[in-house]
């Protein structure tokens, strides 16, 4: 096989891989966007952020994942599917900054919620004064402040450059500075938080499974705490497992034998895909483990479907309108709140008085 044939085969091979990578990134984007939006909708709709600190942490985790999915995943997909960087110097800096900002925010939030769960399980009465929504918001503010501090160097870490007529977005720091930065990211953005997670959840699990309950049957409150703790532990373990290959690849580049060839390039892509996929896994975990979230997802879908049906009703005769409204109201009462039904009836009555035809626009 001559050189031109080899180039053709290699090019065709990478075209196939580019299509596969694009499909995987698209799936991550779709599942992550829909899933995290549903999580935020369930928490905000139920209005439980003001009563439970754990829900605030879950809300913050979903917000960080959603920001990562929306702002980073589409742009990162182009790095592996396009020949050059086309989004400009500012986006080159911003996208990598947001990647590490949301990564730090997620792992710090998981560390904070592990402490919250430990206090809730180990000291259920004494921790009530500490585990307040106000203190949770303070902790979340601290999480984002620390995340901003640790990720801000990445605003200058990457830079748009021209290499042999090709525009690329690559690290601009010297080798020694990049090595020091990557090591610090691994220590503060992975190793220390994972140690905190391991210690707190080990103590929590040991207490849950070894403490003696004076009652024969476990109380409903304790069962609920176990389920929530189980769900958060699964989320934390998935985060650690998904981001581990990313950090290992970077460490191997600095301290191991990691030559730049087709195999190592594929490994780097896979490490990124696994890390990015973590942002769409949490809603799936919530749906599988938590009955509360399953009911919340059904309610959100139910109301969205019924509102969509009502919005499609245009220019209906008055008699038909009344019957349709009664049907929509009676069906929607099981899923939508009373305020929505009230707005529906008030709007309909006003329009029926002024015209023989009606247009519904329930939001």
UniProtKB/Swiss-Prot annotation:
Entry's transmembrane regions: 24-44, 55-75, 95-115, 136-156, 180-200, 231-251, 269-289
Intracellular or extracellular location(s): Membrane
Keyword Lyase: no
Keyword field: Disulfide bond, G-protein coupled receptor, Membrane, Receptor, Transducer, Transmembrane, Transmembrane helix
Gene3D superfamilies assigned to the protein according to its UniProt record, in alphabetical order: Rhodopsin 7-helix transmembrane proteins
Database matches in CDD domains: 7tmA_Gal2_Gal3_R
Membrane topology reported for the UniProt record: Multi-pass membrane protein
GO MF term list: G protein-coupled peptide receptor activity; galanin receptor activity
Entry annotated with the keyword Membrane: yes
Chief location: membrane
Cytoplasmic topology ranges: 45-54, 116-135, 201-230, 290-363
One Pfam family of this chain: 7tm_1
Residues exposed to the Extracellular side: 1-23, 76-94, 157-179, 252-268
Disulfide bond annotation, renumbered to this chain: 92-169
Gene Ontology annotations of biological process type: neuropeptide signaling pathway
Entry GO terms, CC: plasma membrane
Coiled-coil blocks: none
Tissue: Expressed in neurons in the ventral area of the interpeduncular nucleus (IPN) where expression often overlaps with spx1.
Family that this chain belongs to: Belongs to the G-protein coupled receptor 1 family.
Summary of the function given for this chain in its UniProt record: Receptor for the hormone galanin. Receptor for the hormones spexin-1 and spexin-2.
PANTHER family: GALANIN RECEPTOR TYPE 2-LIKE ISOFORM X2 (PTHR45695:SF35), LEUCOKININ RECEPTOR-RELATED (PTHR45695)
Protein name: Galanin receptor 2a
Source organism of the structure: Danio rerio
């Amino acid at each position: 096989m001559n050189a031109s044939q080899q180039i053709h085969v290699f090019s065709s091979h990478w075209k196939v891989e580019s299509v596969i990578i694009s499909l995987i990134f698209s799936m991550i984007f779709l599942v992550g966007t829909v899933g995290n939006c549903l999580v935020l909708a369930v928490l905000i709709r139920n209005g439980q952020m003001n009563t439970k600190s754990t829900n605030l942490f879950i809300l913050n985790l979903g917000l960080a994942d959603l920001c990562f999915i929306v702002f980073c995943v589409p742009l990162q997909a182009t790095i592996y599917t396009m020949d050059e960087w086309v989004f400009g110097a500012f986006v080159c800096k911003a996208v990598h900054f947001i990647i590490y900002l949301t990564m730090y925010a997620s792992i710090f939030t998981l560390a904070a919620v592990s402490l919250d769960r430990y206090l809730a399980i180990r000291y259920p009465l004494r921790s009530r004064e500490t585990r307040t929504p106000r203190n949770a918001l303070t902790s979340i503010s601290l999480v984002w402040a620390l995340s901003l501090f640790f990720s801000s160097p990445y605003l200058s870490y990457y830079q748009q450059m021209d290499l042999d007529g090709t525009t690329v977005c690559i690290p601009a720091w010297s080798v020694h500075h990049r090595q020091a930065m990557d090591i610090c990211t691994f220590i503060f953005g992975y190793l220390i938080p994972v140690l905190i997670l391991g210690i707190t959840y080990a103590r929590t699990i040991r207490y849950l499974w070894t403490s003696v309950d004076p009652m024969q049957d476990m109380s409903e409150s304790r069962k609920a705490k176990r389920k929530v703790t189980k769900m958060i532990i699964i989320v934390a373990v998935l985060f650690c497992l998904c981001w581990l290959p990313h950090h290992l690849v970077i460490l191997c580049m600095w301290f191991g034998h990691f030559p730049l060839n087709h195999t190592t390039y594929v490994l780097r892509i896979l490490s990124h895909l696994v890390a990015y996929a973590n942002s769409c896994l949490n809603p799936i975990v919530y749906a599988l483990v938590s009955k509360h979230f399953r009911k919340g997802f059904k309610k959100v879908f139910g109301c969205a479907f019924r509102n969509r049906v009502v919005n499609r009703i245009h220019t209906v005769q008055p008699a038909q309108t009344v019957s349709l409204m009664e049907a929509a109201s009676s069906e929607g009462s099981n899923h939508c709140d009373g305020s929505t039904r009230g707005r529906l009836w008030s709007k309909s009555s006003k329009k029926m008085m002024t015209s023989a035809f009606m247009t519904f626009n329930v939001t």
